[in-house]
């Protein structure tokens, strides 16, 4: 199906300048999306979107445009973005029987190679098949089985931070240490072996490779709208960037191969895949691709939200005091903190939800393509072939969805009665893990980790934000955030320590 609407004039019959003028006129006044509001330049050219993406400001630009143009804006000649709760359901939700799904936009999500797709870029049929297997690995039952393993890494994390304090470190880069922790956890869950980041107090080469390639990957993805230019630029990319991408998948392949050759009763992801695999299961290349995906999706994003929690708590002293009091009142000893008990603290949950709202791990868009025949989105018909999306940052920080949208107010998630200041909040607008059948499969794991890690940090340490990180949240985004160091002063509490 063509992604571009036909212009009923043959380009070869018109001089280039006239053709360009005709295309501009068509896109402004004759195109099926000509009735949608947005910047005129974005209606006739992809260049504004490309510039917003490459400068890391797409999330901010969408927020500004929604303030000017309303709930739906035309951000490219053939693309719309929304900020309403209804748009989540209409674009990303489960489809009614007999209706076609909104497929992932191939100009944003790199199409899968034959036989080697993963959960994000797989087509609908392959995604359903892969999800059937991975659901077992992320079920509540498997989470309970994995808890002991995960808690071991969290305890090591706390020990290492206490060790930093004993050695006289005035501040620690918590953004880095949280990444050490979450990468070690996901490495063990995905492959049955950690990366050793916590033990060595440094990134494993594979982890370092992932971080170095994120920004480049985002820019190359934006270039998909200019295929000829993309092909030209690829020829001049430094070989090191190409080699890093190859190395990422080769490391995943090597670890998967090693794990498949190892018999173990430990409850890692591959053990569940192997247990339930059959003729309709995953091929080895698909296991390798999904393992590589899980390493990034299951680590960096969780660390980002935890860093945001600590940052916003430090910027809002009353919120920090309340959560610390809740945690230290609820748990008289460290061993009381576990997945179940940490989930019972309402204010803790509010802090996490509010951090997800203000600093979503993926602040931009995840576009879909309207199926052939078109569909109704927010009560209005949209033709087939149009790219549509909901912007995370722009939706979560919109005054049409949330009272005092740019303030850190965890109580908004607790005070839900009719008399509350937040009674009119559109809580369904907050979908940081996306929505519908292709929402993030690791949501339960992420929440369990975030609650427990945050509780352990604030139970063990008095925390203070270093002035070097006063503007930490003012970051650029390239699919995920390009974060700077989060420097915190940690003062260990005098509490009994468990012995190994």
From Swiss-Prot:
Pathway in which the depicted protein is active: Secondary metabolite biosynthesis; terpenoid biosynthesis
Species annotation: Aspergillus oryzae (strain ATCC 42149 / RIB 40) (Yellow koji mold)
Name under which the protein is recorded: Cytochrome P450 monooxygenase astJ
GO MF annotation terms: heme binding; iron ion binding; monooxygenase activity; oxidoreductase activity, acting on paired donors, with incorporation or reduction of molecular oxygen
Upregulating conditions: Expression is regulated by the secondary metabolite regulator cclA.
Function noted in UniProt: Cytochrome P450 monooxygenase; part of the gene cluster that mediates the biosynthesis of astellolides, drimane-type sesquiterpene esters that show antimicrobial, anti-inflammatory, and anti-tumor activities. The first step in astellolide biosynthesis is performed by the sesquiterpene cyclase astC that catalyzes the formation of drimanyl pyrophosphate from farnesyl pyrophosphate. Drimanyl pyrophosphate is then dephosphorylated by the sesquiterpene phosphatase astI to produce drimanyl monophosphate which is further dephosphorylated to drim-8-ene-11-ol by atsK.
PROSITE patterns in the record: CYTOCHROME_P450
UniProt note: phenotype after gene disruption: Impairs the production of trihydroxy confertifolin and deacetyl astellolides A and B.
Alphabetized PANTHER family for the sequence: CYTOCHROME P450, CYTOCHROME P450 MONOOXYGENASE ASQL-RELATED
List of residues binding heme: 440
EC number: 1.-.-.-
Cofactor: heme
UniProt KW keywords: Heme, Iron, Metal-binding, Monooxygenase, Oxidoreductase
GO biological process: terpenoid biosynthetic process
Similarity comment: family membership: Belongs to the cytochrome P450 family.
InterPro entries hit by this protein: Cyt_P450, Cyt_P450_CS, Cyt_P450_E_grp-I, Cyt_P450_sf, Cytochrome_P450_monoxygenase
């Amino acid at each position: 199906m063509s992604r571009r609407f036909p212009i009923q004039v043959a380009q070869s019959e018109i001089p280039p300048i006239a053709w360009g003028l005709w295309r501009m006129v068509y896109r402004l006044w004759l195109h099926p999306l000509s009735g949608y509001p947005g910047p005129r330049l974005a209606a006739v050219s992809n260049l504004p979107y490309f510039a917003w993406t490459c400068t890391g400001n797409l999330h901010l630009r969408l927020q500004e445009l929604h303030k000017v143009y309303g709930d739906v804006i035309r951000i490219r000649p053939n693309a719309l973005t929304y900020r309403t709760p209804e748009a989540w359901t209409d674009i990303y939700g489960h489809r009614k029987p007999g209706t076609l799904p909104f497929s992932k936009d191939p100009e944003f999500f790199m199409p899968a190679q034959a036989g080697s797709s993963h959960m994000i870029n797989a087509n609908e049929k392959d995604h359903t098949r892969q999800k059937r297997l991975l659901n077992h690995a992320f079920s509540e039952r498997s989470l309970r089985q994995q808890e002991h393993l995960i808690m071991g890494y969290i305890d090591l994390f706390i020990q290492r931070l206490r060790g930093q304090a004993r050695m006289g470190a005035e501040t620690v880069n918590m953004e880095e240490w949280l990444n050490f922790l979450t990468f070690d956890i996901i490495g063990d869950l995905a492959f049955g072996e950690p990366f050793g980041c916590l033990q060595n107090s440094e990134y494993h080469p594979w982890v370092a490779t992932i971080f170095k390639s994120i920004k480049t990957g985002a820019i190359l993805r934006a270039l998909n709208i200019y295929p000829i230019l993309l092909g030209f630029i690829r020829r001049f990319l430094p070989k090191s960037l190409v080699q890093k991408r190859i190395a990422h998948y080769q490391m995943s392949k090597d670890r998967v191969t090693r794990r498949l050759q190892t018999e173990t009763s430990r409850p890692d992801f591959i053990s569940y895949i192997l247990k339930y695999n059959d003729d309709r299961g995953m091929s080895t290349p698909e296991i390798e691709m999904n393992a590589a995906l899980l390493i990034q999706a299951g680590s960096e994003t969780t660390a980002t939200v935890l860093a945001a929690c600590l940052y916003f708590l430090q910027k809002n002293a009353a919120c920090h005091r309340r959560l610390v009091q809740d945690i230290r009142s609820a748990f008289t000893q460290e061993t009381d903190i576990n997945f179940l008990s940490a989930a019972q603290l309402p204010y803790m949950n509010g802090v996490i939800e509010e951090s997800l709202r203000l600093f979503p791990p993926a602040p931009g868009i995840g576009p879909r393509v309207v199926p052939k025949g078109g569909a109704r989105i927010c009560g209005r018909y949209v033709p087939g072939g149009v790219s549509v999306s909901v912007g995370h940052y722009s939706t979560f920080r919109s005054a049409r969805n949330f009272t005092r949208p740019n303030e850190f107010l965890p109580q908004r998630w607790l005070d839900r009665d009719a008399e509350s200041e937040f009674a009119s909040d559109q809580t369904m607008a907050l979908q940081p893990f996306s929505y519908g059948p292709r929402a993030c499969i690791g949501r339960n794991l992420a929440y369990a980790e975030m609650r427990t890690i945050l509780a352990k940090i604030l139970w063990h340490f008095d925390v203070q934000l270093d002035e070097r990180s006063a503007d930490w949240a003012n970051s650029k985004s390239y699919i995920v955030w390009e974060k700077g160091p989060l420097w915190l002063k940690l003062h260990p509490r005098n509490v009994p320590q468990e012995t190994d």
